[in-house]
């Protein structure tokens, strides 16, 4: 019986780990679970999509589940969230976010590559409708919908890391102050 490797997370680290696992073991059954709609997208390109420099959001998609299946023989499940890890049973519990069903999957090796989680500021107003966090393509779509409205003239960015600085440039391209 061949090893089963489960990868939790399907963006940069998860897809890279899954592809590496395939190179290390051609016979292993490899299953990748991603709770979002997309795998392997260019997260650093999100500000350029918001600015309009990247016009088509599909340009942000580096790989598709179909590509991974065909090229690497890796089963990819998007909109599937691992809700529980049962180390004693060597199983994960996975929820299909579209269907609402749950299923347990056995593993021999488990790779956790879930990435970072943006922290909402614990201040009054942080949950207002025009307060955004940028982590994925869906977030970028929501920000873009907000900033293209003609009444939007100003933006505030909290965070001065690379993405924050690129967002400042993106808003500038859009004519925002």
Task: Locate each region found by the language model.
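FAD-binding core/adjacent interface of flavoenzyme oxidoreductases
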Residues: 1-6, 66-158, 177
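Conserved phosphate-binding and hydrolysis motifs of nucleotide-dependent enzymes
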Residues: 9-14, 115, 159-164
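Glycine/Thr-rich phosphate-binding loops of Rossmann-like dinucleotide-binding domains
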Residues: 120-121, 165-167
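Glycine-/small-residue-rich active-site loops that bind phosphorylated ligands and cofactors
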Residues: 13, 38, 84, 99, ...
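Beta1-alpha1 glycine-rich phosphate/pyrophosphate-binding loop at the start
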Residues: 2-79, 170-177
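Generic non-transmembrane alpha-helix signal with a bias for helix starts/N-cap capping motifs
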Residues: 61-62, 140, 164
């Amino acid at each position: 019986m061949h090893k089963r490797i489960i990868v939790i997370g399907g963006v940069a680290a998860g897809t890279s780990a899954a592809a590496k696992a395939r190179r290390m073991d051609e016979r292993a059954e490899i299953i990748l679970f991603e709770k979002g709609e997309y795998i392997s997208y260019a997260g650093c390109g999100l500000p350029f999509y918001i600015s309009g420099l990247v016009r088509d959001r599909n340009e942000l998609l580096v790989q598709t589940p179909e590509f991974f299946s065909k090229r690497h023989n890796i089963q990819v499940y998007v909109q599937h969230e691992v809700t529980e890890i049962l180390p004693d049973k060597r199983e994960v519990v996975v929820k299909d976010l579209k269907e609402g069903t749950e299923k347990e999957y056995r593993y021999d090796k488990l790779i956790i590559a879930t990435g970072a989680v943006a922290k909402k500021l614990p201040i009054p107003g942080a949950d207002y409708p025009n307060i955004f966090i940028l982590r994925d393509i869906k977030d970028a779509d929501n920000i873009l919908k907000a900033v293209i409205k003609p009444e939007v003239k100003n933006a505030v960015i909290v965070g001065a890391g690379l993405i924050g600085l690129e967002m400042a440039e993106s808003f500038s391209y859009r004519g925002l102050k």
